């Protein structure tokens, strides 16, 4: 859930987002150590009175500062590639939905059902009720079962959009004529917000995404009512 003046990530709601958070901390630790070392060397050079004017080369030092960055890059690349393959892996999804971007709203189709489609528009500020979030609420939420793998097919009817839900670690481009796919699995029930993350025109900021993750029993009841 996002909140005002937030600096960190939203609480992770999917295994992928948890892995991304761990990877962020891992990379940030490496960056902090490198920055601290560089700052220490700069301060040492500015404050010391010792000079080494006779040194022409230093093979040992050059070897170290060649091998060490390569090792650091490997330590960053390996977990990154692991998460990349995890995000791309889709095995036996319980449900498939199609998200189509428009200027400026989203339309959804539950492909496993005969007639379950709807458009999702942002609720204008003047129509919000107490407790609803400005610029994030929609008239039709995407209801999905939690703890089950869901495949999302993403495309666009006009210009390039991006379907993004930060707490689930999801961001996929919606490109006209191209079908991208993503997978999501929520570990707990709740309402999760996202927005179009690709500048798509004058109302780009007004096409939010709202996912309502619920129990399988409630989802089946909701889907039968919507058809």
UniProtKB/Swiss-Prot annotation:
Segments on the Mitochondrial intermembrane face: 1-14, 88-227
Cofactor note: Binds a dinuclear copper A center per subunit.
Keyword DNA damage recorded: no
Catalytic activity line of the entry: 4 Fe(II)-[cytochrome c] + O2 + 8 H(+)(in) = 4 Fe(III)-[cytochrome c] + 2 H2O + 4 H(+)(out)
EC number: 7.1.1.9
Sites of Phosphotyrosine modification: 218
Binding site for Cu cation A2: 196, 198, 200, 204
Pfam families linked to this entry: COX2, COX2_TM
Residue intervals annotated with topology Mitochondrial matrix: 46-59
Residues annotated to bind Mg(2+): 198
The protein's role, per its UniProt record: Component of the cytochrome c oxidase, the last enzyme in the mitochondrial electron transport chain which drives oxidative phosphorylation. The respiratory chain contains 3 multisubunit complexes succinate dehydrogenase (complex II, CII), ubiquinol-cytochrome c oxidoreductase (cytochrome b-c1 complex, complex III, CIII) and cytochrome c oxidase (complex IV, CIV), that cooperate to transfer electrons derived from NADH and succinate to molecular oxygen, creating an electrochemical gradient over the inner membrane that drives transmembrane transport and the ATP synthase.
Protein family per UniProt: Belongs to the cytochrome c oxidase subunit 2 family.
Protein name in UniProt: Cytochrome c oxidase subunit 2
């Amino acid at each position: 859930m996002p909140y005002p003046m937030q600096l960190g990530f939203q609480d992770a709601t999917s295994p992928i987002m948890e892995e991304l958070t761990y990877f962020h901390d891992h990379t940030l630790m490496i960056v902090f150590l490198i920055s601290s070392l560089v700052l220490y060397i700069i301060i040492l050079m500015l404050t010391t009175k010792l000079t080494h004017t006779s040194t022409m080369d230093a093979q040992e030092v050059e070897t170290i500062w060649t091998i060490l960055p390569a090792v650091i890059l490997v330590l960053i690349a390996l977990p990154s590639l692991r998460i990349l393959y995890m995000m791309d892996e889709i095995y036996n999804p319980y449900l498939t939905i199609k998200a189509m971007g428009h200027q400026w709203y989203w339309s959804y189709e539950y492909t496993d059902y005969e007639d379950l489609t709807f458009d999702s528009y942002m609720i204008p500020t003047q129509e919000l009720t107490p407790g609803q979030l400005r610029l994030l609420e929609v008239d039709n939420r995407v209801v999905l079962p939690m703890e089950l793998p869901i495949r999302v097919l993403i495309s666009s009817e006009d210009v390039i959009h991006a379907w993004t839900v930060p707490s689930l670690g999801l961001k996929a481009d919606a490109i006209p004529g191209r079908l991208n796919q993503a997978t999501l699995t929520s570990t707990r029930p709740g309402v999760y917000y996202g927005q179009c993350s690709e500048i798509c025109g004058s109302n780009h900021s007004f096409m939010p995404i709202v996912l309502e993750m619920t129990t399988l029993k409630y989802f089946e009841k909701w889907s039968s009512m919507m058809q």
